Every structure is written in structure tokens, then in C-alpha cells.
Amino acid sequence: MFTETLRKYPILPFLDRKCCIDYDLPAPTGTGKIKLPVGTGVYIPVLGIHYDPKYFPQPEKFDPDRFTEENKRSRPNYTYIPFGEGPRMCIGKDRHLNFPIRILGYSN
């Protein structure tokens, strides 16, 4: 339930990064390339990815079953990134994922 909530309402609608190597992206038209030199700022549209029906069918619908093990395996990596990924991901990720356990522990 928490994962689906963060899919629909991520903490940040985008992540910003800088290219650390020169990179060529395929052009949206299918011909040519877009060059991204070292130091270029890049925005990763988290909200756009989380609402892309290619990865999350009926993205407006609240459906916690999207995150069953079977459904998670059927999606490409990095299509669910509410905390970012890699060495610059949010340091609060583990705290959030353990939050329900702490709440239940206090209620006993």
C-alpha cells in the first residue's frame, strides 16, 4: 500500500542529475542523436514514469497489487523510483520502508 501511494504521489515529481560521461541519446524522431556532454543537467520525470501506462496500466487507479513479486518482475528496472536509485538515492528510503513495522510495534 505504501509503495502504490508513493507511485501516485512521489516525494519529488522529478530528480535532477548531471552527466558524468558524454552520452548520445537517440533522437525522438528516430534519426540522429542528441549529444549530452559531461556536466549537462538532466531531469528524470519520476511522476511521468510512474504514470506511464506502458509500465503501470490504468495509472490513475490506486492498485497496491501492482507491487506483488510477480508484477514487479514483469516491469523493467528503474520504472519505480520514488527515492531515486544508485549512490545518490534518498537516505530515508530504509526508514520509510520500515515505518509500518515501527507503527505496529508501538501499538502493542
Go through the PLM ranges and name each one.
Residues 94-108:
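Cytochrome P450 heme-binding "Cys pocket" and the immediately downstream C-terminal segment
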